[in-house]
Curated annotation (Swiss-Prot):
Family (UniProt): Belongs to the SlyX family.
One family name in Pfam for this protein: SlyX
Top-rank taxon: Bacteria
Transmembrane segments: none
The protein's name in its UniProt record: Protein SlyX homolog
Protein's organism: Pseudomonas fluorescens (strain Pf0-1)
Length: 68
């Protein structure tokens, strides 16, 4: 394999690696957006649950069993 062929092969591999890195970066950015949305949704659910516990009390409070 000549030096020119080796350089051409390396340039080709580099181009494919650049494309792969960009594709992986795009996926990572989208996943981060999804994680951020899920964190916001989870915070809202936790807040709502805390509000409901404040209004209705916890199910674990010393309530008598249902058969009483």
């Amino acid at each position: 394999m000549s030096l020119e062929q080796r350089v051409t092969e390396l340039e080709s591999r580099l181009a494919f690696q650049d494309d792969t890195i960009q594709a992986l970066n795009d996926v990572l950015v989208e996943q981060q957006r999804v994680v951020e949305r899920l964190q916001l949704q989870m915070a809202a659910v936790l807040k709502r649950q805390e509000e409901m516990v404040g209004q209705f009390g916890s199910f674990e409070e010393d309530a008598p069993p249902p058969h009483y």
